[in-house]
Regions:
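Domain-start "cap" segments at the beginnings of catalytic or binding domains
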Residues: 1-35
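Signature of lipid phosphatidyltransferase scaffolds
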Residues: 2-7, 14, 18, 131-173
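Terminal leader/tail segments of proteins
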Residues: 25, 62, 66, 74-75, ...
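Long, hydrophobic, amphipathic alpha-helical segments used as structural scaffolds
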Residues: 43, 71-79, 107, 159, ...
Length: 173
């Protein structure tokens, strides 16, 4: 009998190590696709978010649909440097203008500026994380709150040491 491999059922834990940018982009899309309430993103700059395809129409549509589903749904982004966000991520900025009460974009300060592990977290149960900003390897875990918890805590530590940097009303200043 010929054995076929199919994707695991949606509730089964998924863990993968990625070596390439293309694999990482696919994994990020998977994490974003799992979001039902909140997305947390930490990265160094708008340019790196753009390189990870956060400016693409499909990604923005996914985030828009999440935010439209409920006013309590959130997108929180922490960046080391927010310069260039308008030119690098115009669709994200348009989304921020439309959903200013649901999206926050912060800039890291203090010890948080030393963080070097970009991550995307959805709903406390799914995450993509780059092991170090300068290295190609990254990991994705889906459907596992226990494995995601340390990265939620890590994000919250970074968030606590950040300040509001971009709002729908201070663009273009």
């Amino acid at each position: 009998m010929h054995e076929t491999h199919s994707p695991p059922p949606p509730s089964e834990k998924v863990y993968r190590l990625m070596e390439t940018r293309r694999e990482a982009h696919t994994a990020i899309d998977e994490v974003l696709g799992q979001a039902r309430r909140e997305i947390r993103i930490f990265d160094a700059s708008p340019k790196l978010l753009k390189d990870r395809e956060f400016g693409h129409a499909a990604c923005i549509d996914l985030i828009r649909n999440l935010l439209l589903a409920n006013r309590d749904h959130r997108l929180r982004i922490a960046l080391h440097d927010t310069r260039g966000i308008e030119s690098d991520l115009p669709r994200l900025i348009a989304l921020l203008t439309q959903f200013s009460g649901q999206i926050q974009i912060h800039r890291t300060i203090g010890q948080a500026t030393e963080a070097r592990d970009p991550m995307v977290i959805a709903d406390n149960a799914h995450f993509w994380r780059k092991l170090h900003v300068d290295h190609p390897r990254s990991v994705v875990t889906l459907h596992c709150a226990a494995d995601t918890r340390p990265f939620v805590e890590r994000f919250e530590e970074i968030w606590e040491q950040s300040e509001l940097a971009v709002t729908g009303s201070n663009l273009g200043l």
